[in-house]
Amino acid sequence: MAPRGFSCLLLLTSEIDLPVKRRA
């Protein structure tokens, strides 16, 4: 598994997940 791809995906999911949790 590529570290760059994983960190990029993790960053994207965390950025999308945080606002959703705050709104919920």
UniProtKB/Swiss-Prot annotation:
CDD domains: humanin (cd20245). Changing residue 9 to A: Abolishes neuroprotective activity and dimerization. GO terms for biological process: apoptotic process; cell-cell signaling; cellular response to amyloid-beta; intracellular iron ion homeostasis; leukocyte chemotaxis; mitochondrion organization; negative regulation of amyloid fibril formation; negative regulation of apoptotic process. Transmembrane segments: none annotated. It is found in: Secreted; Cytoplasm; Cell projection, Cilium, Flagellum; Nucleus. Induction: Release is regulated by intracellular mechanism. The intracellular level is regulated by TRIM11 through proteasome-mediated degradation. GO terms for molecular function: G protein-coupled receptor binding; identical protein binding; receptor antagonist activity; signaling receptor binding. Changing residue 19 to R: Abolishes secretion. Residues 9-11, 19-20 are annotated as: Required for secretion. Changing residue 12 to A: Abolishes neuroprotective activity. The keyword Nuclease does not apply. It comes from the Eukaryota. Residues 1-12 are annotated as: Sufficient to interact with BID and BIM and to suppress BID and BIM activity. Residues 5-12 are annotated as: Sufficient to interact with MPP8. Changing residue 9 to R: Abolishes binding to BAX. Abolishes secretion. The keyword Cell division does not apply. Keywords: Apoptosis, Cell projection, Cilium, Cytoplasm, Flagellum, Mitochondrion, Nucleus, Secreted. Residues 3-19 are annotated as: Sufficient for neuroprotective activity. Homodimer. Interacts with amyloid-beta protein 42 (Abeta42); the interaction prevents Abeta42 fibril formation. Interacts with BAX; forms fibers with BAX which results in BAX conformational changes and sequestering of BAX into the fibers, preventing BAX activation. Interacts with both full-length BID and cleaved BID p15; forms fibers with BID which results in BID conformational changes and sequestering of BID into the fibers, preventing BID activation. Interacts with BIM isoform BimEL but not with BIM isoforms BimL or BimS; the interaction prevents BIM-induced apoptosis. Largely unstructured in aqueous solution. Plays a role as a neuroprotective factor. Protects against neuronal cell death induced by multiple different familial Alzheimer disease genes and amyloid-beta proteins in Alzheimer disease. Mediates its neuroprotective effect by interacting with a receptor complex composed of IL6ST/GP130, IL27RA/WSX1 and CNTFR. Also acts as a ligand for G-protein coupled receptors FPR2/FPRL1 and FPR3/FPRL2. Inhibits amyloid-beta protein 40 fibril formation. Also inhibits amyloid-beta protein 42 fibril formation. Belongs to the humanin family. This is Humanin.
